[in-house]
């Protein structure tokens, strides 16, 4: 029992026990030599040294070295030395193996500072990593820590290495084509994987979230997301209560997939949380992309780190104080007296798209959704550009290629900025069609309602059995009753059959349909399949329906806009090769927005307004 307790305490305790036992045996044998006078040199120190040297060397003395008792006692010491050496080697080997296993399991503590922590391992993880690595290309080495228990650390490491190698290969090919310098991701970003439950304090502290820059909660399930937010918020609150002066606290960025869980998430995270409502984000992009061809590409480019990016810049960083510029009439004008629109004409490497005053309000109001904190505030976007003066703004939202210092000239740019002319938008009266029902349907209809003319007809096409099941839900019926600005017509139709779709679209009253939105089939899935397989099946159905619509578009309706919701980038690329429709990959959009907000918290407001 004593030995069991000692072994449970680890390698150090076992080595100490072995050392004490060996010393005791050496002293015991030396005392026998002294007591019986078996050694020629009866000095106690000499006897102890003889026993110790014999034990260490494990060398049995010969008969010529002393008396028979001396040879016998030192022979026992040599045997004890053999046992000591063997057991010591075994203990050290076991300790090293245990430590290596700990490292393999990803339980080692992270010692980095100002890093990003991603909690959760799924398909979106790689999209987030790609965005972070892209954003780090013009920065010094940054660290990303990924924590989850979905698979072993070694497997996560292998997948990350493979992913980075594939991305670098693709980027190198594009760089050669454009004659640009290729920079591998690994030169600016290191990724550390850790194994553990994302909601456990010990695992979170192992990732050193106390000293990280931001935390991205990347769980598929809303309940799990709220648990992780609560755990992270607890650690951040402990840091706040510790009262360390000058300590910049991390914050949490998360996505909620069901709008009903927004309040719970916000209350769990408090002022340390920036939460994105996935249905609202995706439905807004889907609905607006259906208005004009190519708009989805604009959204995608705006949200990700490729090309020009949106930066949140303090006015002091632009060094406007006391600066004067030459106006169109030749007079000198103080730069603080310019409007934001006028200021843009003196910027050489950036474009201001908005501005704000004061600090962003992160206060939590119980019963209100996270994004509502901006409802009563003046817009920070372009509509205020001609009315808002530079002196009335503390921060700018700037669109530029890299986060280099913004250059202000005394004279206007040679390429003049054309004034944005607001056009009176006249809502069309032509009907729209939505192919398939999904978790986004109600929210998409609400977004369409905001810009379609009153009583515009919207057809919702779905297979009879699925449509009946969907409309039988009382909550769905309650939400449908709230949609009053457009007329909904539910059409039971075999949308997976080309002939059925063609027959419907070829009817004279249906040829006026202006746009078709294909929603991902994520409501009626095979529960026996994994989530990844379910998404693959949904994308396959989307591509099949797209091909049918594309043929109908070519034969009957050349002006038809088609917008598709996809789950995977690979499937989007496959569909893009044969058509020029608008594609929105939900996981990519969510990953891009989460990453941008995790890097600069204040960007959440402008993304909400966009």
Locate predicted features.
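Cytosolic regulatory regions of ion transport systems
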Residues: 1-610
């Amino acid at each position: 029992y004593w030995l069991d307790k000692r072994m449970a305490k680890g390698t150090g305790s076992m080595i100490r026990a072995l050392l004490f036992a060996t010393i005791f045996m050496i002293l015991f044998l030396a005392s026998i030599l002294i007591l019986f006078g078996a050694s020629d040199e009866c000095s106690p120190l000499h006897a102890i040294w003889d026993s110790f040297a014999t034990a260490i060397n494990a060398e049995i003395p010969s008969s010529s070295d002393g008396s028979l008792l001396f040879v016998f006692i030192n022979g026992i010491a040599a045997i004890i030395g053999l046992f000591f050496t063997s057991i010591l080697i075994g203990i050290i080997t076991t300790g090293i193996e245990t430590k290596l296993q700990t490292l393999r399991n990803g339980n080692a503590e992270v010692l980095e500072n100002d890093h990003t922590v991603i909690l959760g391992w799924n398909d979106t993880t790689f999209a987030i990593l790609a965005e972070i690595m892209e954003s780090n290309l013009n920065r010094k080495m940054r660290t990303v820590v990924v924590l989850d228990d979905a698979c072993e650390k070694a497997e996560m490491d292998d997948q990350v290495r493979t992913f980075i190698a594939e991305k670098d290969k693709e980027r190198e090919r594009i760089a050669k084509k454009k004659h640009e310098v290729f920079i591998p991701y690994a030169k600016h970003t290191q990724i550390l994987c850790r194994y553990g439950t994302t909601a456990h304090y010990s695992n979170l502290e192992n990732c050193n979230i106390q000293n990280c820059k931001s935390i991205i909660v990347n769980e598929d399930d809303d309940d799990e997301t709220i648990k992780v937010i609560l755990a992270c918020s607890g650690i951040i609150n402990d840091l706040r209560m510790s009262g360390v002066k000058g300590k910049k606290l991390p914050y949490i960025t998360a996505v909620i997939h069901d709008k009903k869980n927004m309040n719970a998430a916000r209350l769990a995270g408090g002022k340390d949380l920036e939460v994105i409502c996935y249905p609202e984000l995706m439905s807004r992009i889907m609905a607006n992309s259906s208005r004009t061809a190519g708009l989805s590409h604009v959204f995608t480019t705006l949200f990700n780190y490729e090309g020009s990016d949106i930066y949140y810049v303090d006015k002091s960083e632009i060094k406007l104080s006391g600066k004067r510029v030459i106006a169109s009439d030749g007079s000198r004008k103080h730069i603080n007296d310019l409007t934001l629109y006028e200021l843009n004409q003196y910027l050489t490497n950036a474009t201001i798209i908005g501005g704000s005053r004061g600090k962003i309000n992160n206060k939590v109001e119980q019963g209100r959704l996270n994004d509502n904190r901006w409802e009563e505030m003046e817009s920070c976007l372009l509509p205020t550009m001609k009315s808002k003066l530079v002196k009335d703004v503390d921060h700018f939202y700037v669109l530029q290629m890299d986060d280099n210092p913004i250059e202000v000239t005394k004279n206007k740019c040679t390429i003049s900025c054309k004034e944005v002319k607001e056009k009176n938008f006249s809502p069309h009266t032509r009907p729209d069609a939505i192919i398939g029902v999904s978790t986004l349907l109600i929210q998409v209809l609400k977004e369409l309602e905001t810009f379609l003319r009153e009583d515009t007809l919207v057809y919702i096409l779905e297979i009879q059995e699925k449509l009946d099941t969907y409309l039988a839900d009382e909550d769905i019926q309650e939400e449908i009753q709230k949609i009053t600005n457009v007329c909904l017509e539910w059409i039971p139709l075999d949308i997976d059959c080309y002939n059925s779709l063609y027959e419907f679209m070829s009817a004279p009253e249906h040829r006026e349909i202006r746009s078709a939105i294909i929603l991902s089939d994520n409501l009626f899935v095979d529960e026996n399949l994994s989530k990844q397989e379910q998404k693959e099946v949904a994308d396959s159905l989307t591509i099949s329906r797209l091909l049918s619509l594309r043929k109908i578009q070519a034969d009957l309706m050349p002006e038809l806009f088609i917008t598709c919701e996809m789950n995977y980038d690979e499937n989007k690329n496959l569909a893009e090769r044969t058509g020029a429709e608008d594609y929105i990959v939900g996981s990519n959009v969510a990953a891009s927005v989460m990453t941008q907000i995790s890097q600069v918290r204040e960007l959440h407001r402008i993304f909400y307004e966009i």
